[in-house]
Regions:
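Claisen-condensing/thiolase-fold acyl-transfer catalytic domains that form or cleave C-C bonds
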Residues: 4-105
Length: 105
């Protein structure tokens, strides 16, 4: 099963903190995890393939969901081969509210 990840990326540090909080890497290891290429399109955890907040404009919460749905349908521009499950994550304020949506096909 291929897991896709769609994390709210309002700031770079938010991505690093969320990767650690979700258990994709240990506390303090997110920067090395990213530098190792884990989040690239062909990496272990393809990440935010549509660009999201750091590269795309519009309604950020809906963009995360829309790209997750495209990945599950197999219609994404940067399709992750074998994508079967997608975690869509969003947060508000200074990381004090949080929501997670799991999508599957």
């Amino acid at each position: 099963m291929c897991i896709r990840d769609r994390l709210y990326d309002c700031f770079t540090i938010t991505v690093l903190m969320t990767l650690e909080d979700y258990g994709f890497c240990r506390p303090g290891e997110a920067a090395a995890f990213v530098a190792d290429g884990a989040l690239e399109h062909g990496g272990r955890l393809p990440f935010n393939t549509s660009g999201d907040l750091l590269s795309e404009t519009g309604m950020p919460g809906m963009q995360l969901i829309m790209e997750g749905v495209r990945q599950m349908r197999g219609t994404a521009r940067l399709q992750v081969p074998g994508a079967r499950l997608c975690a869509v994550s969003n947060q508000g304020g200074t990381m004090h509210t949080h929501a997670t949506l799991l999508l599957g096909n």
